[in-house]
Amino acid sequence: MMRYALGVEYDGSEFLGWQQLGEMGPSVQATLQQALASVADASVRVVCAGRTDAGVHGQCQVVHFDSAVTRPPRAWILGTTTRLPSSVAVRWCVPTSEDFHARFSACARRYRYRLLNRQVRPALQHQFLSWERYPLDAQAMHVAAQMLLGENDFSAFRSAQCQALHARRELQAISVRRDAEVIEICVQANAFLHHMVRNIVGSLLMVGTGERPMEWIAELLAGRDRTMAGPTASARGLVFVGPLYPEKWHLPMEVSV
């Protein structure tokens, strides 16, 4: 058996999320596995670096799979992508060792959230942008966000459906910046809880509108009470940028540190 790592890009708008959940609806995982199976002429199971929810997009999701069929990377890339819908594409393929694991070998994961901040909702690229009509103070949001850095208990930003054994995560970097009418929030952590990024964004938006002071974010973190935090932000503006791996795995530079 040969193990391969793939970099996958997808528009999550029409999927019920990454994970295959029986016959409930289309998932990115099931769609990718079906295409890979056609190339391998055998069933294929993929393991991803980080599962995404319904409507969340992937810029460079990393997966691994095992196959008894040997194919050059180009054949896996082109053969699989031609069998995928236009909303999913394989960006790269790297043969790797059997001890590489897309999830457990990753040392960090990155997300990006983008929203349009103007009175009128977006018509172009609306599936990739959230929207907030009230003026936002991006600088205040950025300052407040820095209070979340470090290893903390993120229970205040954890969904009720989260199945993680504990809520401690290391938030390694977070930034909020404005580019004209678009506000971009970038987050990096060793791992994330269910809805963690969207719940953080929802709370930061309340700081941005002036509804809450910057110090409120630190109070939420210390309080560990989800009911006291802001609402869950829309999935529409969220992109899983991708995981990061140690250089020893010899993956493309965009996922290596």
Curated annotation (Swiss-Prot):
It catalyses: uridine(38/39/40) in tRNA = pseudouridine(38/39/40) in tRNA. One of its GO terms (biological process) is tRNA pseudouridine synthesis. This is tRNA pseudouridine synthase A. Its EC number is 5.4.99.12. GO terms for molecular function: RNA binding; tRNA pseudouridine(38-40) synthase activity. The gene is truA. The active site is at D53. It comes from Xylella fastidiosa (strain M12). InterPro entries: PsdUridine_synth_cat_dom_sf, PsdUridine_synth_TruA, PsdUridine_synth_TruA_a/b_dom, PsdUridine_synth_TruA_C, TruA/RsuA/RluB/E/F_N. Homodimer. Substrate binds at Y111.
